[in-house]
Amino acid sequence: MKESYDYIIIGGGSAGSVLGGRLSEDVSNNVLVLEAGRSDYPWDLLIQMPAALMYPAGNKLYDWIYETTPEPHMDGRKVGHARGKVLGGSSSINGMIYQRGNPMDYEKWAKPEGMESWDYAHCLPYFKRLETTFGSKKGDPYRGHHGPIKLRRGPADNPLFQAFFDAGVEAGYNKTPDVNGFRQEGFGPFDSQVHNGRRVSASRAYLHPAMKRKNLEVQTRAFVTKLNFEGNKVTGVTFKKNGKEHTESAKEVILSGGAINSPQLLQLSGIGDSEHLRSLGIEPRIHLPGVGENFEDHLEVYVQHACKQPVSMQPSLNKLKMPFIGLQWILGRKGAAASNHFEGGGFVRSNDDVDYPNLMFHFLPIAVRYDGTKAPAAHGYQVHVGPMYSNSRGHLKIKSKDPFEKPEFVFNYLSTEEDKREWVEAIKVARNILKQKALDPFNGGEISPGPEVQTDEEIIEWVKRDGETALHPSCSCRMGPASDEMSVVDPETFKVHGMENLRVVDASVMPRTTNGNIHSPVLMMAERASDIIRGKKPLDPQYIDFYRHGVHDKDAGTVK
C-alpha cells in the first residue's frame, strides 16, 4: 500500500473497473480500487462460462443476496435482488446482454435545465469508445470497433429464434438488424458480452489488462466501512480486510458501489436526509434528501410454452448431459456452454400513446427460470417481458450505523395505474406474438401463466405472484443541477452536491432508467466520467439521425 493515492475507487464493479483502467492510463495517477468481494478468478467456471449464468445468483461467494422489504402492491412479497459481490461486480454474474437503451432515453435525460449535455449525441461517442462490435460493419457510424468490450452478435440459429422473429412480423411489428443501431424498435438478434466462448466482464475488459501498471492497485475482500472527512472535504476511506482495519488517504474518492451500496455508504457518512440520519444517531454533514430516493428497477415475468418439436435447449438442463457440455467448453470454449442463449428478442410499443418502445422481449429457446427452475416440459421456449419505463418509484434507507447491516429498500412495483395498465398490455402483446402462425409448428401450448389467467385482474394477480426483478436497480443518487433538491450528483462533474473530493459514478446516478438492460449505459457513464475526472477534452458529440415513431416511415431501417 502507498502512503496516499490520487484516487480511491470504492467498488470494483462495472463502473469501478472502467475508472480503474482509464484513470491509471495516466502514469502520474496512483489509483486504488477496493472491492468487497473476491477476485474473478480465470479458472472460476461459474462466472467465466456464459451458460453458467444462473449459478452465481444466490451464492454468497458471488452475490450480496439482497431482497426488498415486503412490496406493498405485490401482496407483501419480498423480491430477491442478486448483486455482484466479486471483482467485476454484477458484470461478472449478469446475463451478458448488451443494450444501450433507446436514443430517446438520453433525449429525455437532457430535457431538464442543466442536463443538456446528456443527450444522445453526447453519449453516443462514449458508447462507441467502449465497444468492439463484431456483428456490425466497420463503417457503421452507430457502433464502435476498437473498444475493450468485445460484443458477439447472437447467431440466433436455433429455428425457434427465426420463428419468433417471424411471429413478431405477423403480429404487425418489424425486424431490425441492430437494436443498438439506427433502429431499436422491432425484433432481431442481440449483442452479448461474450468473446471466444467466455464472459466479457468489465473487470476482464478494463482492470485486468491494467493491473500490470505500477500505479494501479486492486484490493479484493476489502469492505469499506466509512468515508473520512475534514469538514465537508473527503480525505480518504477506512476499510476492513482479513479482520483488520485499514485507513487510506486520497486526493479524491470515487464511489462506484452500485445503486444499493452507494446510497448506503453516503447515508452512513452523514450524507442524506437529515431527519432520517438523526433518527439513527448519525450527525448529518449535508442535507441531501434525494440520497436513496427515486429508486427504479425493471420487473419481468416469463411467458413459457411447451415445444412440439425436439429443437429447444431444454435437454441441456439434464444433469447427465452437463458434464459433457462442460467438457466441451473447457477443452474448446464451444458448445451449449459457450453462449448466454439470450441471442435475440425485441422492443415494441404496447400502445400508441408512447413515443418509443416501452416493452422489451428476451427470447430463449428453453423454458427455465433465472434460478434454474425448469418448466415441466421435454422441450420448451419462453419470452421475458415487462414494462421498461414504469413510473413506480421506491426508496432505500439504512437501518442503523452498522455498515455491515444491509439497508432496507422497496421499489413499489405495480403501485400506479399506468404501471398496471402496461403490465396487462405486456402480457397481451406477448401472447399475441406467441400465437402467430410462424410458431405453429412448435407451439405445444402455454405453460405459464397458463389458461386460467385471462382477465386483466387475473394478469395483475399473476404478476404479483410471479414477477421477478430484471436486476436493473438504478437512479438512487440521481444526477441533476444543485437547484433540483432531490438530485445528489452534479451532471457535469459527478461530484456530490456540497461535498469536496467525492464523486459517485455508477447506476445510482442515472436520472431515469433506460428501456433495456442497464450495464451498457453504466459503462458509457464511467467512460465519460473518466475524461471529466482527468480533465480531458470530452469527445465531440455525434449528431446523427435515429428512428423515431411518427417521424420516420414505419419501415425505416427494418429487415425485409
From Swiss-Prot:
Its cofactor is FAD. FAD binds at residues 6-35. It catalyses: choline + A = betaine aldehyde + AH2; betaine aldehyde + NAD(+) + H2O = glycine betaine + NADH + 2 H(+). It comes from the Bacteria. GO terms for biological process: glycine betaine biosynthetic process from choline. Keywords: FAD, Flavoprotein, NAD, Oxidoreductase. One of its GO terms (cellular component) is membrane. One of its GO terms (molecular function) is betaine-aldehyde dehydrogenase (NAD+) activity. The active site is at residue 472. InterPro entries: BetA (IPR011533), FAD/NAD-bd_sf (IPR036188), GMC_OxRdtase (IPR012132), GMC_OxRdtase_N (IPR000172), GMC_OxRtase_C (IPR007867). The keyword Oxidoreductase applies. Its EC number is 1.1.99.1, 1.2.1.8. The keyword Flavoprotein applies. Pathway: Amine and polyamine biosynthesis; betaine biosynthesis via choline pathway; betaine aldehyde from choline (cytochrome c reductase route): step 1/1. It is an enzyme of class 1 (oxidoreductase). Involved in the biosynthesis of the osmoprotectant glycine betaine. Catalyzes the oxidation of choline to betaine aldehyde and betaine aldehyde to glycine betaine at the same rate. Belongs to the GMC oxidoreductase family. HAMAP family: Choline_dehydrogen. This is Oxygen-dependent choline dehydrogenase. It comes from Staphylococcus xylosus. The lineage of its organism: Bacteria, Bacillati, Bacillota, Bacilli, Bacillales.
